[in-house]
Amino acid sequence: MSEVRVENLSLAYGVSWSGVLFINQTQLDLAPDNLSTLDFTIFHELGHQWWGAVVGANSNDHTYMVEGLTNATALLAQAAVQGPDAATNSLYAWMVTPYLNLLGGSGDAVADVSIFDQPASAPLSTLAYGKGALGFLAIRNQIGDTAFLSALRSYAESFRLGIAEPADLLSAFEAASGQSLQDLWSVWFDQAITTPAD
């Protein structure tokens, strides 16, 4: 695995390709005291070595399957390596706060939206990275860590070097947990009905 520090990746903090992480030095220099930004960026881009690289999904049509799942699992990795406080800080900085700002502003929007059909009032980044991750964390809360990780393992094995659809990931969570999760899945990914209480 190589890390390459680059001067400009537009507005992205990092980009991942197979075996290489590009870290945007220019963007990170804007907040040199914020090491957690660098830390979470690296956890997120490492996550793309699985979600998006080894296990594919149509990220143009179902961006949350790659970005939301990567954010959710990056939090798990960060908690394991740096402790739960670091992961909680990243959760709020990268997912909860942007999503609450959306809810308080233009209101909720559907997370499973094509990059070509995204609403102007709801940035895809907030939906895919924020609401998407929160949806996967809601599933984890519903089914527990063991079933959640078992589902991800099964999903990764089934779609290694393949392209999965949303129903494939939902099926993996349902099979691992023995629960019907369609309603919970729909609330977070297919509908625009969540509230700050969710």
Where are these regions (language model features)?
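Glycine-rich, acidic and aromatic/proline-enriched surface loops and short helix-turn segments
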Residues: 10-15, 100-102, 141
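Amphipathic alpha-helical substructures
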Residues: 85-87, 123-198
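Post-HExxH zinc-binding segment in Zn-dependent metallohydrolases
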Residues: 20-29, 62-107, 179, 183
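Alpha-helical scaffold elements that line and support the substrate/ligand-binding pocket
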Residues: 46-56, 70-74, 131-149
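Short, solvent-exposed loop/turn segments at the edges of secondary structure
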Residues: 15-18, 36, 65-68, 130-134, ...
